[in-house]
A protein has these predicted regions:
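Intrinsically disordered, low-complexity proline/glycine-rich segments
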Residues: 1-133
Length: 133
């Protein structure tokens, strides 16, 4: 857990478009970015670079970038929703749960397990320990 980033695209949100008849909710795609520094770790006893390791049960508390879609996502009906870590490294376990790594699949702008945008961890939070399994 550190200064890593998860990117999800497209995060399709309903955006009011002004027309002469009044605002019309229109689905528009936005990029969705989640910082791993805002993730609540599920494994506090496994440290990498003096920071708790992130596993598949960790919860990203905030993802942003879709604030213009003020009516929320077409699937989750949220904006700035949570990030769920969907697929991790099954050969390396952190507290018995698959570890998250660079290129791990995420679901972003989520309501429980219902993601509005598919995503992936594209910027590592540390480069001391590489999870290649």
């Amino acid at each position: 857990m550190g200064a890593g980033m998860d990117l999800g695209f497209p995060d399709v949100c309903l955006t009011p478009i002004p027309t002469p008849a009044g605002p019309v909710p229109t689905p528009l795609p936005y990029p969705d970015i989640a910082m791993t520094a805002t993730t609540a770790p599920a494994a506090y006893n496994v440290l990498v670079d003096c920071m708790p390791a992130i596993n598949q049960l960790s919860a990203g508390l905030l993802s942003n970038g879709d604030e213009a879609g003020t009516l929320g996502g077409v699937v989750s009906h949220l904006f700035d929703g949570q990030t769920e870590y969907l697929v991790g490294c099954f050969t390396i376990l952190v507290d018995g749960v698959p570890a998250q790594r660079l290129t791990s699949v995420t679901g972003q702008n989520c309501l429980a397990k219902l993601p509005n945008a598919p995503g992936m961890c594209l910027c590592p939070s540390q480069v001391t320990v590489l999870t290649l399994g």
